[in-house]
């Protein structure tokens, strides 16, 4: 099954620009034909208790989780 996803960061920006709630943006995303959301791992850690139920309520799923790593400071050369 193919899923079309949107980055949650775009949804967060839409909430700011349009002054709408998370539930409203989730409903709009679903209405626009998206099935899933790509989420930053840190956002899930910090806001998952709010975001995940709203996604589920709208019939959306988490299609991918990404994170950013600072490898230049992780490895000692």
Which sequence ranges carry the predicted segments?
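N-terminal pre-domain/capping segments
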Residues: 1-77
């Amino acid at each position: 099954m193919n899923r079309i996803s949107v980055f949650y960061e775009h949804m967060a920006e839409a909430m700011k620009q349009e002054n709408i709630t998370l539930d409203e943006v989730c409903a709009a995303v679903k209405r626009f034909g998206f099935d899933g959301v790509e989420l930053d791992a840190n956002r899930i850690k910090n806001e998952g208790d709010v975001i995940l139920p709203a996604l589920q309520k709208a019939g959306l799923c988490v299609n991918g989780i990404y994170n950013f790593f600072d490898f230049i400071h992780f490895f000692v050369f």
